[in-house]
């Protein structure tokens, strides 16, 4: 497993996505607040992608230099995934599963095209509307927003988008993802 992060600064969104992927994949992460705290030998390394296509190419090249037989790549976002895919193609690698996060329309198109095997689709327009509702409610009567049950934040949901579903893992296909995508 190769990890393409934003950078090495442990930015909260980078850490949450990174550790969330690893835990979901069954990797023990001793410190959920620090990227790279895992010691599982299946994780070959973390590289900085700057969340860009160009950074994804460079980061993937570094991971391939370390482990040419890599077979799973996690990326912080879909532009980094596009770059990782380019580097894999340039190296003649096939059958490598690239997974990502965001679910914007270009990323869903990449799932449909087979560039990204799966992406976690978020809903920023729903996040924004719920935020505005919370502000209006607070302004009207002082009611503060509350976190979703069992969480420290308000959960607006997420869907895994893939055209290669796995039994036991809830997902939607790229056609449905296209109906729900943004950007």
What does each model-found stretch correspond to?
Residues 1-183:
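A residue-level marker of the well-folded mature domains of exported/periplasmic proteins
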């Amino acid at each position: 497993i190769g990890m393409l992060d934003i950078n090495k600064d442990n930015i909260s969104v980078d850490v949450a996505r990174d550790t969330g992927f690893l835990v979901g994949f069954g990797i023990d992460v001793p410190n959920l607040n620090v990227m790279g705290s895992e010691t599982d030998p299946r994780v070959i390394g973390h590289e900085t992608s700057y969340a860009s296509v160009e950074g994804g190419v460079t980061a993937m090249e570094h991971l391939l230099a370390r482990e040419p037989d890599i077979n799973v790549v996690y990326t912080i976002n879909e532009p980094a995934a596009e770059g990782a895919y380019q580097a894999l193609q340039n190296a003649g690698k096939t059958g490598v599963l690239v997974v990502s996060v965001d679910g914007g329309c270009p990323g869903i198109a990449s799932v449909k095209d087979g560039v990204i095997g799966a992406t976690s689709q978020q809903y920023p327009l729903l996040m924004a509307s719920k935020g505005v509702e919370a502000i209006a409610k607070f302004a009207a009567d002082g009611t503060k927003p509350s976190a979703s049950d069992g969480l420290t934040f308000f959960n607006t949901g997420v869907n895994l988008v893939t055209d290669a579903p796995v039994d036991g893992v809830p997902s939607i296909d790229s056609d449905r993802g296209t109906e729900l995508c943004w950007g």
